[in-house]
UniProtKB/Swiss-Prot annotation:
It comes from Homo sapiens (Human). Changing residue 466 to N: In allele PGM3*2. Substrate binds at residues 370-372, 496-500, 505. GO terms for biological process: carbohydrate metabolic process; glucosamine metabolic process; hemopoiesis; protein N-linked glycosylation; protein O-linked glycosylation; spermatogenesis; UDP-N-acetylglucosamine biosynthetic process. This is Phosphoacetylglucosamine mutase. Changing residue 239 to H: In IMD23; decreased phosphoacetylglucosamine mutase activity. The modification N-acetylmethionine is found at residue 1. Belongs to the phosphohexose mutase family. Pathway: Nucleotide-sugar biosynthesis; UDP-N-acetyl-alpha-D-glucosamine biosynthesis; N-acetyl-alpha-D-glucosamine 1-phosphate from alpha-D-glucosamine 6-phosphate (route I): step 2/2.
Length: 542
């Protein structure tokens, strides 16, 4: 390790005084002008991680659904998954080190993780369309090269495409070709094969309006659309030509405001979807004949996908264990429908994609989606081999179902939640089942719910268990919540500390919006009283 060169280069990417950042679920995120030193240092860290794992590591420059003036960075581990927790700590430590401590921190990490510094390193880099992203990704490259790492800069990519590239490179091409054409071809081939088998390929299935959040999704969907155009025609809105990234558009805006994005005219019963800024989340929506807006979120996407997979397995005659993974935020109606109607087991984990992904890996087939529209399906290697064999060996009807499943497996991006891949999966399933967007929406009716935030002096006074559904501290809070829940039909409520600010998040659902609102307010008051609320007491009325 050439410590002199590192010190010299590090001075060119100096850390602003007093800036402290934390590597969270989404990596580092803050205002773009504060990130130059972090990018350089993540280039260094990616090289160490690559040497330690003897694998290609990814670095993605993006801040997803944050405003355009923000940026961020996250590292991608060898199988396309998120960075290992112990390395998240190293990332935080390295990003916050003062200039004079940089050498010591790098040596510490190398020793702690038994990194062989003679080992070759290879890093792949991708970035989104933010004005600051190109310069910041150059800082990552500086970090990689000063530590003697090799790199490939993919330039503009969606976040899930970078996860895919890393996965392909570390599986010797078995998962796919690690090029953008390889990605387009793999997904499109599977999609076109599937839609060929749809009996109802009328025009209403073939067109879709897509809000691209003025982000990278527009660029990549435009490059890709001619590959799958015989199965689907997409109309792109908020394509970045004039609007601002994530401003009044994108999956996050649509979900939180419960209304369509700016700049998209919707006729009644037209199928529409929105990506987020880096195209790893997707939500669907439509207007009914009365002009009412209907959102189809991650819960309903997971339900459509897992129901379809279950039906195919039954048809093939395979009894594989399939599981759906949700968080406490999943609507109670979706959980009931999956367990009682579809007889698919549902598991709950803590909030955060890495927890869901990890749990989903425990099943032959694991489907996970957060309500915000981030998710995918994972298939064990044994299942993939079994399905391939079935697609070649079984007789007609069973073979057709096995072939469908084989194509669906290829259509999923198993490295990460991917808006483009998920969109094609959903479109294929709707066409194959002959479902309209309203029929999909009508699988079950969401229970009315309300989410609130309560300001507290210190969010750490709240600790939870049972996948964040029960409060352990402060004493008496869970008992108070239990008593309040008993007052309303079909109700539940939970509280959890925010991961980023001193607030406590409250979720409540019940059989009517009025009851859900009352319950959420009463739980907020209990939090305010028992968990050190500050400022004004929570007021009723929304």
């Amino acid at each position: 390790m050439d410590l002199g060169a590192i010190t010299k280069y590090s001075a060119l990417h100096a850390k602003p005084n007093g800036l402290i950042l934390q590597y969270g679920t989404a990596g580092f995120r803050t205002k773009a002008e504060h990130l130059d030193h972090v990018m350089f240092r993540m280039g260094l860290l990616a090289v160490l991680r690559s040497k330690q794992t003897k694998s290609t590591i990814g670095v993605m420059v993006t801040a997803s659904h944050n405003p355009e003036e923000d940026n961020g960075v996250k590292l991608v581990d060898p199988l396309g998954e998120m960075l290992a927790p112990s390395w998240e700590e190293h990332a935080t430590c390295l990003a916050n080190a003062e200039e004079q401590d940089m050498q010591r921190v790098l040596i510490d990490i190398s020793e702690k993780e038994a990194v062989n510094l003679q080992q070759d390193a290879f890093v792949v880099i991708g970035r989104d369309t933010r004005p600051s992203s190109e310069k910041l990704s150059q800082s990552v490259i500086d970090g990689v090269t000063v530590l003697g790492g090799q790199f490939h800069d993919y330039g503009l990519l969606t976040t899930p495409q970078l996860h895919y590239m890393v996965y392909c490179r570390n599986t010797g091409g078995r998962y796919g070709k690690a090029t953008i054409e390889g990605y387009y071809q793999k997904l499109s081939k599977a999609f076109v094969e599937l839609t060929k088998q749809a009996s109802c390929s009328g025009d209403e299935y073939r067109s879709l309006k897509v809000d691209c959040a003025n982000g990278i999704g527009a660029l990549k969907l435009r490059e890709m659309e001619h590959y799958f155009s015989q199965g689907l025609s997409v109309q792109l809105f908020n394509d970045g030509s004039k609007g601002k990234l994530n401003h009044l558009c994108g999956a996050d805006f649509v979900k939180s405001h419960q209304k369509p994005p700016q700049g998209m005219e919707i006729k009644s019963n037209e199928r529409c979807c929105s990506f987020d800024g880096d195209a790893d989340r997707i939500v669907y929506y439509y207007h009914d004949a009365d002009g009412h807006f209907h959102l189809i979120d991650g819960d309903k996407i997971a339900t459509l996908i897992s129901s379809f997979l279950k039906e195919l397995l039954v048809e093939i005659g395979e009894s594989l264990n399939i599981g759906v993974v949700q968080t406490a935020y999943a609507n109670g109606s979706s959980t009931r429908y999956l367990e009682e109607v579809m007889k698919v087991p549902v598991y709950c984990t803590k909030t955060g994609v890495k927890h869901l992904h990890h749990k989903a890996q425990e099943f032959d087939i694991g489907v996970y989606f957060e309500a915000n529209g981030h998710g995918t399906a994972l298939f064990s290697t044994a299942v993939e081999m079994k399905i391939k064999q079935s697609a070649e060996q079984l007789e007609d009807k069973k073979r057709k179902a096995a072939k469908m499943l084989e194509n669906i497996i290829d259509l999923f991006n198993q490295a990460a939640g991917d808006a483009i891949s998920d969109m094609l999966v959903i479109e294929a399933i709707l066409a194959l089942k002959g479902l309209t967007v309203q029929q999909w929406d009508a699988l079950y009716t969401d229970l009315p719910n309300r989410q609130l935030k309560v300001q507290v002096a210190d969010r750490r006074v709240i600790s939870t268990t049972d996948a964040e559904r029960q409060a352990v501290t402060p004493p008496g809070l869970q008992e108070a919540i239990n008593d309040l829940v008993k007052k309303y039909k079909l109700s539940r409520a939970f509280v959890r500390p925010s991961g980023t600010e001193d607030v406590v998040r409250v979720y409540a659902e019940a059989d009517s919006q009025e009851s859900a609102d009352h319950l959420a307010h009463e739980v907020s008051l209990a939090v305010f009283q028992l968990a050190g609320g500050i400022g004004e007491r929570p007021q009723p009325g929304f």
